[in-house]
């Protein structure tokens, strides 16, 4: 479980996370193109991840995302405690956040799109008006409206660009 994995990170210096963000993590090809195209059309963009806010908040700032949610690591004296704070972002939380933001923004769920790759994305994909499985596992692909198995995130935009 997420909590068990987080417990293994106990006493890891926060500086190690900075190294991972700067040198290890890479944006999926086409991410910047997709987000820029969405922004040109007034689309709100929300990142909901089972990962950690340390990374999603940086991505939100770097890419100009409207919203970002993830698991929040508890940090004391610059070190991880091995615990999470706040709500754990699991499959249900992802779907709930989609519904909450659609309601908050007065957008019918039928006008929302959710994209994911794993089983924990299925409730969100099913709650959305349109679900995209991106380089996804077979079970997730079976629950989506479309599947993108090759190429980058710009392929998502290309599905709608000429409609």
What are these regions (language model features)?
Residues 1-3:
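A phosphate-binding glycine/aspartate-rich beta-alpha loop in the early core of alpha/beta enzymes
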């Amino acid at each position: 479980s997420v909590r068990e994995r987080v417990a293994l990170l106990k006493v890891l210096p926060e500086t190690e996370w900075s190294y991972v963000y700067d040198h290890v993590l890479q944006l999926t090809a086409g991410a910047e193109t997709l987000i820029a195209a969405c922004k040109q059309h007034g689309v709100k963009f929300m990142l909901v991840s089972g990962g950690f806010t340390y990374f999603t908040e940086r991505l939100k700032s770097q890419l100009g995302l409207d919203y970002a949610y993830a698991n929040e690591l508890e940090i004391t004296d610059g070190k991880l405690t091995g615990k999470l704070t706040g709500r754990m972002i699991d499959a249900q939380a992802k779907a709930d956040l989609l519904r909450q933001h659609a309601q908050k923004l007065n957008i019918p769920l039928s006008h929302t799109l959710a994209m994911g790759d794993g089983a924990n994305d299925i409730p969100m994909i099913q709650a959305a008006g349109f679900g995209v499985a991106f380089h996804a596992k077979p079970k997730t692909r079976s629950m989506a409206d479309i599947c993108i198995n090759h190429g980058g995130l710009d392929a998502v935009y290309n599905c709608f660009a000429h409609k």
